[in-house]
Amino acid sequence: MRSCRSCNVRVLVAIVCGLLTGIVLGLGIWRMVIRINRGIFVPVPSIPVQFCRNGGTWQNGRCICTEEWKGLRCTIANFCENSTDGEFTFGSIPVGRYGPSLQTCEPGTLNAGSPKATRLCNVSEFGNIELQNVTKGSCNINLQTLEIQINNQTASAENISREAQVLTADASKLTAQNITSATTVVGQIFGKANNESQAKKTAIATVSQILDASEDVFQKAAEMDNSKSFSNLIKQMENYSYSQGDQTVVEPNIAIQSVTRDDNSGPSVLFSVQKGSSNSLVSGRILINKTANGLNPDGQTELQILLNTGENRKSCGFMVYQNHKLFQSKTFTATSDFSQKIISSKINESEQQRQNKVSVEMVFNPTYDKRELRLHSYACVYWNFLINDWDTQGCQKTGNTTEFLRCNCSHTTNFAVLMSFKKDYKYPKSLDILSNIGCALSIAGLALTILFQILTRKIRKTSVTWVLVSLCSSMLIFNLLFVFGIENSNKNLKTSDSDINVKPENNKIPESDTIETPNPSCTAIAALLHYFLLVTFTWNGLSATQLYFLLIRTMKPLPRHFIIFISLVGWGVPAIIVGVTIGSIYALSGNKRYWELDYRQEEICWLAVPKDNDYARSPLLWSFIIPVTIILITNITIFVIITVKVLWKNNQNLTSTKKVSSLKKVFSTLSIAVVFGVTWILAYAMLISNDDIRIVFSYIFCLFNTTQGLQIFILYTVRTKVFQSEASKILKSLSSSFDRTKPMPSITPLKLRVRMYNMLRSLPSLNERFRLLEPSGMTEETSLS
């Protein structure tokens, strides 16, 4: 037993640390193998990944195709090929749309950059896709010019309507001023061009094109719409809807159906819109029934409206808008990509005034991605021109089923079902065994390292204690926050379809189309994680800077107040970054209720990821990725310099009485790499698009970085002579206590003269220290181990 106590304690410590490292590495490899095997034996999904072709997506049991394709699997062409007509060249054009020419107006003209002409792709009476004649525009006439012409009547309505259609062909280039001018022009065409039906049909195409502009542009246009051009356009189109006999006009974003009834017609008219393979409106999906007795929705119904007049009327009209962009509300805010359809029913005003009982019944089957959204509530509303906003007066809910939302209103105008959704977030599972073990070992290692560095400061006489303690402290706090706070407590909140607000008395307009469950504690955790991880990287950079001055610049003593300066940088700069980030997001959100989700994610309490690859507005990019990337590039540069000039090369400033072993150099290199945070470069490998490679790097990244605290403990605490000496004393004390408690045998031992020799040889110390040869008043030493 005495011989065992004389064993070199470093061997025992090395064995223990080796076992811990081996266990963690083994768990990591085991988890990686399991994950790869799971990736190989993936169960066959009910719908193959490539079932929907040509950009189609599988939603709610069917393929949603792009405008260029149709059919069950989006395999039937629905566009006109590239074409040339005279001097104009056109790309592919979806059916029902006008395609802009590739030739644009020259610089210096009023419409510089706008297409010179458009061309309609349509379906003939025989079902063939064919191109129509080219419509030319003028490069010296813009929408503001058309406003003047329509007011002064200096040009025909047909010419003005044609010019407006060409100018709005590329909706992505429309500004708020363009939207306001275009709606003004089109509204006056409907009001003044009494006998020019072609001008009005072209104007409908213009409205459809305008509705392709972004929601942000429409919101800005509504703010500057002092003349109420939106309201005027809506009213004029209502009047147009019942004045065209039995004519149907269908554009991708708007459909109009006029109905003329006779004595054989019933008291009700049913207008239906059926689902299709794309989100655009097409003529085959618009149905009318003059003798309907009630609503009769089926699985293909997207919406229906039943107009009850009580007695036969000569004319009525229906209209459906693909989205709500013309109806800019001050009480209801649209923030998601979901398209709120608007449906309108209208009868002649003079006849309506004599009508005592006019009612409208509606049924909606909203199309949205049920994998991402869950319906929370809805309201049956109409557009009130007096307040220029949505109103619920005279409208009520009449119950709903699993698919359909039903409404009833006592008047006719533009109706909608304003829906609010809760996003169906996919909350991640709790940390697995590997992450928990790695974090637990790191937390324990960091805590022991901090205590050791503080308690043995005077004994070791090293100049890096404060930097290492600050680094370990920030890393320790980050690990604790990560383990106990990264998960959002909202994941435990359960919602179901029974939560939908369907009570008639609760017909209240929602504030937004997206409902979020606020969680200020999660936002606070995200801010703290953001701060302490930035602090960790900042101290990584300061550690690299300090070693650079000590080893490469041989700057001893360090500048006066150096510790105070780096402390202000290490703890203060990250606080400024986090504070500016949160303050900027809050200021830019305006009156947005759920501004915090612009800063953090809902799935976990961490920085928000870019939406639609919009990295320019992502806090993750500006307040984390860029600062961390700068620090890592600097650290790696310094790491390479120190490795080449100090660790793996004989330095003239260092003296040693023995040869430095390769093992010693490896440990010194690893020590610096860990403190510099070099392993974080593996995070960039996780951006690889290949799933298998990304998974491998993800596990390697987690393995190295969750155990970073353990690595620091082994390399900066366990390997020091002070720790080994204290650990040796503790082991000897425990061994002595064990010997005293061990019962002695009852047999009296023979008294023999025995001489014992200790044949174990102590291993040579691998801990290197150096002093500068220049005289200095400083007596501190710098250790790389």
Swiss-Prot record:
Cytoplasmic compartment residues: 457-465, 545-561, 645-668, 716-785
Domain GAIN-B: 271-425
Sequence ranges on the Extracellular membrane side: 27-435, 487-523, 583-623, 690-694
Tissues of expression: Selectively expressed in the intestinal tissues.
Keyword Transmembrane: yes
Null allele phenotype: Deficient mice exhibit less body weight gain and an increase in intestinal contraction frequency.
Disulfide bonds: C380-C407, C395-C409
Signal peptide segment: 1-26
GO CC annotations on file: membrane
Protein location: Membrane
TM region(s), chain numbering: 436-456, 466-486, 524-544, 562-582, 624-644, 669-689, 695-715
Topology term for the membrane: Multi-pass membrane protein
Keyword Disulfide bond carried by entry: yes
Glycosylation sites: N82, N122, N133, N152, N159, N178, N195, N239, N289, N348, N400, N408
GO molecular function: G protein-coupled receptor activity
GO terms under biological process: cell surface receptor signaling pathway
Residue segments, region GPS: 380-425
Protein's job: Orphan receptor.
The family this protein is said to belong to: Belongs to the G-protein coupled receptor 2 family. Adhesion G-protein coupled receptor (ADGR) subfamily.
Matches recorded under PANTHER family: ADHESION G PROTEIN-COUPLED RECEPTOR G7 (PTHR47767:SF1)
Protein name, entry field: Adhesion G-protein coupled receptor G7
Upper taxonomic lineage: Eukaryota, Metazoa, Chordata, Craniata, Vertebrata
